[in-house]
């Protein structure tokens, strides 16, 4: 016990004699409390003490040890605070300087267009639908009245995995899956990625389409025309001159392509549409004598290019921030 008292007084004196310096405090801690420190050695000597005396002596050693540690930690905390205060005092901070500008992200222009289109049709009661991007030839071609000899099946247009599976070339397969699982009336808008083996200024191997499908007992071409007029006026935010040109799509009859008159006096195609072909309705178990429907298909990148006067479709996928930041 006498040795414990002497060790405690020695430790107190050593702490009091320390000049300011965190390194010196660490050396003191190692000397007294490290693996080979004085207090550690004292605890190890307890094995030489009679068993009945060990608890009392051990408690006194721990009490003395804790006292020194409290002084050590208090001194360390005070010195760390002094060092921090000195560092802050030495730093010059001009609080009048403007803060760092927060960089704000923004939606991709293609995403902006998809949101605008979906919002317009959702407000008219259309439900958003989706389907797989890896499709079977049945949903991508057969069910849509596209026969085996149709050019769209050729290798130069379609990415095939095998004789039955492919990357979908259109979102029309969503229409088939929806009609198989729902009874009329049906109103859906189906945005999604599609794939075709083409790459130039106006084509990319992956692009986005949005398709509409409306099936009911009295769906007609007049409704279709009115819907498209209202949509184009809302999307381009101007009262555009619109024309419908007769066209051919295997899955609609009659079919039309829709053009808008631009400021340069030229007509530009924006989408395709038509009344759902009776064969397509039969393929999904809907009686074409009782129900009719119309469908609309539009390329998202095409609409985006027209709205923002972009000349090269590939710009949307090059991740050039100088280009993308214009659409925030």
From Swiss-Prot:
GO cellular component, one term: cytoplasm
Swiss-Prot/TrEMBL keywords: Aminoacyl-tRNA synthetase, ATP-binding, Cytoplasm, Ligase, Magnesium, Metal-binding, Nucleotide-binding, Protein biosynthesis
Alphabetical GO biological process terms: phenylalanyl-tRNA aminoacylation
PROSITE patterns found in the cross-reference section: AA_TRNA_LIGASE_II
Catalysed reaction, written as an equation: tRNA(Phe) + L-phenylalanine + ATP = L-phenylalanyl-tRNA(Phe) + AMP + diphosphate + H(+)
Cofactor annotation remark: Binds 2 magnesium ions per tetramer.
Gene Ontology terms, MF aspect: ATP binding; magnesium ion binding; phenylalanine-tRNA ligase activity; tRNA binding
Domain of life, source organism: Bacteria
EC assignment: 6.1.1.20
Pfam families in UniProt: Phe_tRNA-synt_N, tRNA-synt_2d
Cofactor: Mg(2+)
Enzyme class: ligase
Binding annotation for Mg(2+): 253
Compartments, record wording: Cytoplasm
InterPro entries assigned: aa-tRNA-synth_II, aa-tRNA-synth_II/BPL/LPL, Phe-tRNA-synth_IIc_asu, Phe-tRNA_ligase_II_N, Phe_tRNA_ligase_alpha1_bac, Phenylalanyl-tRNA_Synthase, tRNA-bd_arm
PANTHER family tied to this protein: PHENYLALANINE--TRNA LIGASE, MITOCHONDRIAL, PHENYLALANYL-TRNA SYNTHETASE
Subunit structure of this chain's protein: Tetramer of two alpha and two beta subunits.
Similarity-based family: Belongs to the class-II aminoacyl-tRNA synthetase family. Phe-tRNA synthetase alpha subunit type 1 subfamily.
Protein name: Phenylalanine--tRNA ligase alpha subunit
Organism field: Actinobacillus pleuropneumoniae serotype 3 (strain JL03)
Organism classification: Bacteria, Pseudomonadati, Pseudomonadota, Gammaproteobacteria, Pasteurellales
Encoding gene (name): pheS
